[in-house]
Amino acid sequence: MSQFWGEFPEKVIQTFQHLQVALIGDIKKCALSSPLFPELSKLDAHSQHHLLASFELPRFGGVTPGVMEQLRDAESELAEAKQRLLRERLHAVANRQNIPYLGDCMYYDAPGISQEELLQAAFLEAPTPAWEHERIRPLWPKDEWFRDARQGPYLEDYGNIPLGDLDTLCLAFDALVEEHWMPIYLLISTFSMFQQYGTQPLLLECAQSAGSLIPACMMTDHHLEPTGDRQADKEARQDYADSQDSIQSMGDFWKEFYTKDSGKKIPDSHKSRLANDPNKVGFTKSALFHKQPLSHSLAQTWANFRGTQDKADLVKVTMDMNIEKYTVRLPDAVRTTAGPLYIEWINLPRMSENSARKLAEVGWNNADICGVDLAVKSHIAVGTPVRVIISLVDGACSDMPTATMCAFEVNLASQNNRSLNLPLLSLPFSRLLADLHDFQNRVKIACQFRDPEGFNVGTPMLSFSSLEFSELKQTAFERNSLLRDSWSEIEKRACHGGGRCVASQGIVQTWEKEVNPPLKEYAPLVLPPVPQPKRNFIDQQTGEVVQSFMQKSRSMRFKSPSDLWSRPSVDGGSTSTQPPSKGSLRCENVPGCAYEVDPLHLLYYESVDVPKDTLAGTLLARIDVRAKAAIFDSAVWRQWVRDGCLKPKIKMRITAATSCFSGIVLGACFDAYRRIPAATKTGITASLVTGLPNTVWATRDTSEVEWDIDLAAVCGHTFFALEDTFGYMDFLIYVLRGNEITAVADWSIYVSFHVDWTQESMLATLIPTFVWPPKPTDISLLKEVWGPYRFTLDGTEAKESFAIMPGTAILHGQQIVRTFPRVVAAHFRSWTGKVRMSIQEVSSIFLTGTYMVGVSWNATADLADIVTRKHWIVKSNEIFEVDLYCPYGENPTFTGQANGKPFIIVHKLGGIVGPKDSVGTFGFMIHIHGLTGVYKNPTLHSGDRSVGSAWFRINNIADDNLVFNIPGRIEDIIAAAGKYDVTNYVNPTSLLFSVTGLHGGIIRLHITWCPNTTLGESKGTLKYMQYLYHTATENFFGDQATRGIIDQDGFTIDIACGDFFGATRVGLPGEVERLGIYSSNAKSIAEIRVSFEVLSMNFYGSTIKVT
């Protein structure tokens, strides 16, 4: 050993001795000297003797968590100090002080330099245990490469060593550590303890430098015996280290080191952290966080030993192996406008609930996610061009661009990839079940495949492991953090890169959320009124405040805590009309959970009677809210009269009673354009009202419904107080499913309408709900309610089949009903995607059963056919997506009778079970919540020519004097009895005008005709006149033309649809632009045909057409 190292320079040895004396003095000054190193008693005798002789430390036992923390952290201090300290800082100090030096990191014989630099020199010349008996020093390279170096001003100075020779010096230092790792580790650990008690801060970084060289030696020394050949031993150690999956942590090493004689292997010792190759990307605690001073942990331990409380420890750093291995398989494709999308969602798991509760119980209230280390392993062949975007997503936000915190795109052609992500998200951390659930499930990982290159669904594409670094804090007041001061500091220690998302080879690109985005511009702030303080009830006898009878110790575990505490009031907020799930806890089920209704928001109320033996299809009430509110004369009505137009958002509250035995299903709809005849009293079904804004509820589990209606969205306009202008405020309440068991007596429903007049008015009189032309994504607007359907108690009816043809009309008895979403869908020949749906059980709770949902290309599929294909087993009110079974790859929209059509089948599995005397059937409703993944749907018309639509035809003309008008709105033309017949044509474009409330725009008319006699005998003319404005006394004329009976071209003229306010509707009285057609020789005309072409058109409000 001495032959290799030579001797230390005299100045260096003296400096180290002075340092040793200074350290001993600092120890004696320390008030908490007794618990400084409780691990001492566990060391071997030689190490104890060395430390006691060198530092005069007392003997004592015990294990302090802070000391174990330091032992574990020493391993993580890898190449940081060796590269940054030995090259950068020491070299900079030498240049600044003009100190003669040997190489980049070795100083000696430098009189006049500061104590900090002396400490540097002393530590970097760290001696072995034999330093007292034999002077040794690093090998001074005196020959060959050093001969031409410039000589220093002192005799002992060997001059400057070129920067490239640092490796030779590091080899010498490595040799020292490899042979004497145990005493050097103990030495630097002891040095690190005294940072707070007088030792220079630079000394800690020197200690970390040596610590970076120790873990591999510790991992191998107790497994391999030295052979005497230094190079052979070093290669053996390296081979052993390379064969291990990961580097042991300090804690695992000590456990194994002291139990090596027992022959037991420490289980799961490799799970402490990922193996870290210094040449690749990787996180360590030291990269992200400052070290917690060991003295702080020792002081905390000593305070606990004395029974005192120390409130200074407000920050805790955790490092969790969130996912050791997760395999991502290619998911099903979702159809989008940009093509198929393959995306897999994975929750980033946290610690167990029990571990989280224990931390919460001791006071940790906030969890800051500071960094996530993701390692990706590809499972496809090298060179296959498949890419995947892996995103860290905030699951509380439904908007993907907003929710994405950072993301990176991986080229799976490279087998191993790694990315460091700094998401910056703080989560509440408490004993509340909601907070624990949010902490464990909020952060998600999304794997989005661009193009799977023909790989089958379900193929394992990649595996990934994740390592998360978090920081726990006790209060929001805590501003202290162990996180590095800036991103640049983190980047230096993490991977010498840049940005919040840093990646290794194989990463194509990365995305990062802006840390300080500009704030959006909002409307002027409207301050709400100050809430009135709540009064406590005082016991008249004792004078004490009466406590709530819901004790704090009561355990309340419920599915959705937000349902309990965020109960919406009439003043604002939006409540889903879907009934709550079985596991949820509604406000009315909690004692004392009352809410206040502001009477100043009440527009009108009415009590609706329900017969005790009510039947399905019965209309209970038709409420003209505008007319009834005028009679009721509420405060809101007076505001309405004063302002003229109603505010856009209204709330309809329906309060009934829960009846779990009756099986009644009630509904309400908003018929703004009176498409349901006023004489209708019975026969109201879901097929009739599903195209109107509506809500449905079953009395078995719902007693109150709050329905928020946005008039701007469903109508595109508001309503005038003193007259019906654009439409009508008609609300219908009806029965969709009658009694299974007759009620004891007639009962009633309380219906009220509320308007918050502090809300903003509509920005314009008319806001279009649909703009021509239709787009492929508009087919996803399909939202309907079907049913009720049933399974009989005797099992004779155990299956219900539903054809999914979104472009066809709905059958309603002997009538057909056309709705706005279905007419829009009819503009496309086919569609692709999935159906979002749910099933709502509505029968008496005495009847129970289970069912599955399957798909088929025909309605004859039985249970054996369903279970062999993809199918779903669902519960009531759960929303799920159905991927249809289609042999052609596309689903027909409005035809398919010859080649088949897709069906959704609901088949009974178990049940139906009920008491002996049960009556009725097991009933359910089907809710369609829209279509997803719709893309590239071919239209009915070719894209390279104008779109013309047939409107009507006039024939059988019996009078030579023909006069008829074409109005400036698309509607059915009525024949003139005894003069001519009219045929109105049906097509998706003309139907679009009939299923919307108002329309306004420009159309181009194409008018053609033909004679009914031979060409030589035909005579006469046909002419038109455009009336821009017309009254009995005044006319504004537009274009005009006269043509002969024999004419091949006909007329083409543009005409505006809309009254003076910019829109019109079918059958609306008033003056609109029109076109007059005249002929004095009309009997010579066989027929006149009129088609139209939409140039531009806005549609307002969706409704239905019943024929």
Curated annotation (Swiss-Prot):
GO terms for biological process, alphabetical: transport of virus in host, cell to cell
Mod. after translation: Specific enzymatic cleavages in vivo by the P1 encoded 3C-like protease yield mature proteins.
InterPro entries: Nepo_coat, Nepo_coat_C, Nepo_coat_N, Viral_coat
Spans annotated as Disordered: 553-584
Main location: host cell
Compartments reported by the entry: Host cell junction, Host plasmodesma
Keyword Transport among record annotations: yes
Superkingdom of origin organism: Viruses
Other notes: Virions are comprised of 60 copies of the coat protein.
Name recorded for this polypeptide: RNA2 polyprotein
